[in-house]
């Protein structure tokens, strides 16, 4: 589609409407740790901590959708309807397991969080706020359920009827710690902030007055939920070792802080007055003992991020306005410069995904193009290969469609921006080694964007479409324990269409697709894929949900209330193991409006537990059953036991995905294109980049110049193949020193009183230095060659389309001190 500049035409808004802010954010998610991103003009969406947070407000109604249908139907042609049998007595079973709760308040927004895993505990915070001329009046109510939302109890008295600051959300502790922190609003003249803490799954709360005013939500250590850190409004870094009972300021002038492994804290600090003034000159510090001792591990820092086992820093280059990514795998003790193009002030880097084996890195293109290049790393995170050109990633708002399909290893989906400004979806099944278009669903026709009505592709709507306010209520959905299932909105043609999308499903991790539902829907997965539930996205009141017990082939509709509600959100426990779904919305009369939830338990639909005969063997990534390499991805095959579509039974909460791996012989598919090589579109072999032909491949690693001899291939990080093809590849140490990083803490840590000593030493050694230079010039031929080789590699990076430009200081002018979201998203 053409890149929309605003909301799509024809999207009507109901004056009072409903706004859904649906955020499913697991704690410490790497997902997209964006480095250097120029901040959006508006404040970013607030991020709730904890396993999952869902927030709804009374704004903006959804655009109109199809009228809900009753009964049952099959995806595809109407003639196939007779293939779908009606589940016996499902209406009576669901009616007996539908629970309504009406919330007796008129709050304008609702936030919901699960506390713990499989505990059934849900906290709901409702907020009502009226801004007055000078101050604002606010009221909060807190509700608790311990049966997955079937019943709620008002526990506002446990927080002394205090107004809770919704921008901090509900900070839920990791794992099953049962810890909850709510940040309260305090009067302007107070010495510090106030929090309410619970360590028993919100049965009781303790009020604690803070010695500082918090700037950010309390951050739990992933290893010990008693350890907390927070930033103050005065940029102090505060740490608690006893779940917030007592706090200690361990450092001042802090811009951004993050927990690392083993309770390590990384943070940036300014030295010249403010984070804004020092952007690009920040220092990166580390403490391994909660603030007793510190080590400066980097200077000239623009931003930093964590992903997998890698620590990243964006560093200002010497005597330049460009930045380079540096990588450490030992918590910052040593650094190496990533073999990536440098970026200018108006550009950014973004960590799209990172695990223990590799990194997906986006490098923005110069200018306001809205796209860049995806690079994939080696297992050290240092040497990168080009993976995908013209990757859509807008600078305004910072939107990318990059999606990790968690239901099948190695699969990612994203969008590219074509030269005609149309947006197309691409998918990789081998962790970025090769990208291709999504296959056209068999039960769909090509739309008006297709030049050939018989040949087109499926294009997926994700974050970018949502940001442009298209009629797309949800991003793509997949779950690790619902093997192979992917659900997404999309259109079928030559590019993404602005027309009303339909919902598509894949049951094999994205290899094949089928239209599942007509028109936009909200959807969720229950019982590890045993049930899929959907609700139509409509601006009219609704009272119908749809569900499928065969991975979206056949659908039943159920009227959950006789009084339709204005729908605001669909909520289910994270992890896709629950049998319960909650429908949230409100009812409205002439003068009143009330929040209401309906929780539907599907336990009686799947009455029996699944047995061995209910499962069948499925070979993942299978595309050619006659080929001995069929199913080989990243060096091995995986056979799964999957629930038969015809089996109506319950996987249960204890269900564990059963899989049997087997190693494959190595082939071209097990190799990425090496440094200096790329795969043309729809090609399997790697070819040399034109701008590198005739040049020797040399790069700087750990301060030593290395020479690369390659046939164009390097093994994909994490690939398990053995034997078979083994392309020649050799890295040789040239025994020459080079600049492997721009971080040099020792220079920054020099005290001012050491300057005379340094000057004296320099004066005494001046003659020796001059003589040494003359000797080197006369007898050593490698020095000039070394500098030349390094500059050649830099020219290659620039020729690759990401050269350094004169800065317009977009990033700096947009940065503001009161938000850590500007440095890393």
UniProtKB/Swiss-Prot annotation:
Primary site of residence: Golgi
Region described as Golgi to endosome transport and interactions with GGA1 and GGA2: 777-825
Range of residues in the leader sequence: 1-31
Lipidation (S-palmitoyl cysteine): 781
Motif (DXXLL motif involved in the interaction with GGA1): 820-824
Cytoplasmic compartment spans: 776-825
Positions of post-translational Phosphoserine modification: 809, 813, 819
A Pfam family that the UniProt record links to this protein: Sortilin_C
Annotated TM spans: 755-775
Domains (record comment): The N-terminal propeptide may facilitate precursor transport within the Golgi stack. Intrachain binding of the N-terminal propeptide and the extracellular domain may also inhibit premature ligand binding. The extracellular domain may be shed following protease cleavage in some cell types.
Name of the encoding gene: Sort1
Keyword entries, A-Z: Cell membrane, Cleavage on pair of basic residues, Developmental protein, Differentiation, Disulfide bond, Endocytosis, Endoplasmic reticulum, Endosome, Glycoprotein, Golgi apparatus, Lipoprotein, Lysosome, Membrane, Nucleus, Osteogenesis, Palmitate, Phosphoprotein, Receptor, Repeat, Signal, Transmembrane, Transmembrane helix, Transport
BNR repeats: 143-154, 196-207, 238-249, 285-296, 326-337, 375-386, 426-437, 504-515, 546-557
SMART domains named in the record: VPS10
GO cellular component, as recorded: cell surface; cerebellar climbing fiber to Purkinje cell synapse; clathrin-coated pit; cytoplasmic vesicle membrane; cytosol; early endosome; endoplasmic reticulum membrane; endosome membrane
Listed name of the protein: Sortilin
Disulfide bridge map: 84-554, 255-275, 446-456, 610-649, 632-664, 666-721, 673-686, 700-738
Subcellular localization: Golgi apparatus, Golgi stack membrane; Endosome membrane; Endoplasmic reticulum membrane; Nucleus membrane
Positions of short motif Endocytosis signal: 785-790
Annotated region (Interactions with LRPAP1 and NGFB), positions in chain: 610-754
Entry-linked InterPro entries: Sortilin_C (IPR031777), Sortilin_N (IPR031778), VPS10 (IPR006581), VPS10-sortilin (IPR050310), WD40/YVTN_repeat-like_dom_sf (IPR015943)
Pro-peptide region(s): 32-73
Tissues and organs where the protein is expressed, per its UniProt entry: Expressed in the brain, particularly the piriform cortex, the cerebral cortex and the hippocampus.
């Amino acid at each position: 589609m053409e890149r929309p500049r605003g909301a799509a035409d024809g999207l009507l808004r109901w004056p009072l409407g409903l706004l859904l802010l649906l955020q499913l954010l697991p704690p410490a998610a790497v997902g997209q740790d964006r480095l250097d991103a120029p901040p959006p003009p508006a404040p970013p969406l607030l991020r709730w901590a904890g396993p999952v947070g869902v927030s709804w407000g009374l704004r903006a109604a959804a655009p109109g959708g199809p009228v809900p249908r009753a009964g049952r139907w099959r995806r595809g042609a109407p003639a196939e309807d007779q293939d779908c049998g009606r589940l016996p007595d499902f209406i009576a079973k669901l009616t007996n397991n539908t629970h309504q709760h009406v919330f007796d308040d008129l709050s304008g927004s609702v936030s919901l969080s699960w506390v713990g895993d499989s505990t059934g505990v849900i906290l709901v915070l409702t907020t009502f706020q009226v801004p007055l001329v000078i101050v604002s009046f606010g009221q909060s109510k807190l509700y608790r359920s311990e049966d997955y939302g079937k019943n709620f109890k008002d526990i506002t008295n446990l927080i002394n009827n205090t107004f809770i600051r919704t921008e901090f959300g509900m900070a839920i502790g990791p794992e099953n710690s049962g810890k909850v922190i709510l940040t309260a609003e305090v009067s302007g003249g107070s010495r510090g902030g106030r929090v309410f803490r619970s360590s028993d799954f919100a049965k009781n709360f303790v009020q604690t007055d803070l010695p500082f005013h918090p700037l950010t939500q309390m951050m739990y250590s992933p290893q010990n939920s008693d350890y907390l850190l927070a930033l103050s409004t005065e940029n102090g870094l505060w740490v608690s070792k006893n779940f917030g009972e007592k706090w200690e300021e361990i450092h001042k002038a802090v811009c951004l802080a993050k927990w690392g492994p083993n309770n390590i804290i990384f943070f940036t600090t300014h030295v010249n007055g403010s984070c804004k003034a020092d952007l690009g000159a920040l220092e990166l510090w580390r403490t391994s003992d909660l603030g007793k001792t510190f080590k400066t591990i980097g200077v000239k820092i623009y931003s930093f991020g964590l992903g997998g086992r890698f620590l990243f820093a964006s560093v200002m280059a010497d005597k330049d306005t460009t930045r380079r990514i540096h990588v450490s795998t030992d918590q910052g003790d040593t650094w190496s410069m990533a073999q990536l193009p440098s970026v200018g002030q108006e550009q950014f880097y973004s960590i799209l995904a990172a695990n223990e084996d590799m990194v997906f890195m986006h490098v923005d293109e110069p200018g306001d193009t809205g796209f860049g290049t995806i690079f994939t790393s080696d297992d050290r995170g240092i040497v990168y290969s080009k993976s995908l050109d013209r990757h859509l990633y807008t600078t305004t708002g910072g939107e990318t469609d990059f999606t990790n399909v968690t239901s099948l290893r190695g699969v990612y989906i994203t969008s590219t921006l074509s030269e005609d400004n149309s947006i197309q979806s691409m998918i990789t099944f081998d962790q970025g080694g090769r990208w291709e278009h999504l296959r056209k669903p068999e039960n769909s026709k090509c739309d008006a964007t297709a030049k050939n009505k018989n040949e087109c592709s499926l294009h997926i709507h994700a974050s970018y479409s949502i940001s442009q306010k298209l009629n797309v209520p949800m991003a793509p959905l997949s779950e690790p324990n619902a093997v192979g299932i992917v659900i997404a909105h999309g259109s079928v043609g030559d590019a993404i269409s602005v027309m009303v999308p339909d919902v598509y499903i894949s049951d094999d991790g994205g290899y094949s697709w089928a239209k599942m539902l007509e028109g936009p829907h909200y959807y969720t997965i229950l019982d590890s894929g045993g049930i899929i539930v959907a609700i139509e996205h409509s601006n009219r009141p609704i009272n119908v949900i749809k569900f499928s017990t065969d991975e979206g082939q056949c659908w039943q509709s159920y009227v959950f209330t006789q009084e339709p509600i204005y729908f605001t959100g669909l909520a289910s426990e994270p992890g896709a193991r629950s049998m319960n779904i909650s429908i949230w919305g409100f009812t409205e009369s002439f003068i009143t409006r009330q929040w209401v939830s309906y929780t539907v338990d599907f336990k009686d639909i799947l009455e029996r537990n699944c047995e061995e005969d209910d499962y069948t063997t499925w070979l993942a990534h299978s595309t050619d059953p006659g080929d001995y390499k069929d199913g080989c991805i990243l060096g091995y095959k995986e056979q799964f036991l999957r629930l038969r579509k015809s089996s109506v039974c319950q996987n249960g909460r204890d269900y564990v995905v059963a899989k049997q791996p087997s190693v494959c012989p190595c082939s071209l598919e097990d190799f990425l294109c090496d440094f200096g090589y790329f795969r043309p579109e729809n090609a399997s072999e790697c070819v040399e980049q034109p701008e590198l032909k005739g040049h020797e491949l040399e790069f700087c690693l750990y301060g030593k110049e290395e020479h690369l001899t390659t046939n164009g291939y390097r093994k994909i990080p994490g690939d398990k193949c053995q034997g078979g093809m083994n392309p020649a590849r050799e890295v040789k140490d040239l025994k020459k020193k080079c600049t492997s990083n721009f971080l040099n803490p020792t220079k920054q840590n020099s005290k001012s009183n050491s300057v005379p000593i340094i000057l004296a030493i320099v004066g005494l050694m001046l003659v020796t230095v001059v003589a040494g230079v003359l000797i080197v010039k006369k007898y050593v031929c490698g020095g000039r060659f070394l500098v030349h080789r390094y500059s050649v590699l830099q020219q290659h990076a620039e020729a690759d389309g990401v050269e350094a430009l004169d800065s317009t200081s977009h990033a700096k002018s947009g940065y503001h001190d009161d938000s850590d979201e500007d440095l890393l998203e």
